[in-house]
Amino acid sequence: MRLPPEWVERAEFLLRDAEGHLEEGVYWIVCFEAQQAAELYLKALILALTGLHPYTHDLVELLESLRDLGLEPPEELYAYADALTPHYTMSRYPGRKPVVYNRGLAERCLRYAREIARWVKEKAAEVQR
């Protein structure tokens, strides 16, 4: 199955942008961009399967939607999604919740987003066969 290219391009741009921000030390934006990239990848897969995408930023909900469509996301992806989801809001509103954005957290968020992207690409390739 072919993932919608404009969704994948935007997600890949965000991942590349996050890598640059990681090197610049702008850790809060890395976490936000990682969450957004993961969200775009998950929605791209749902869109490819159904022709529609959900209106949510909750990555766990998106994984549950994929499970309901017959795919089986591995358990660790749920943990990654749960860790990434709050950064959609927390990274954009300083002082809302006490989060210390540092390199370690930013690297984890980027790794989690890459793992979600990898899984989405694998699933799209499997469905194509």
Predicted regions and their residues:
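Terminal alpha-helical segments
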Residues: 1-129
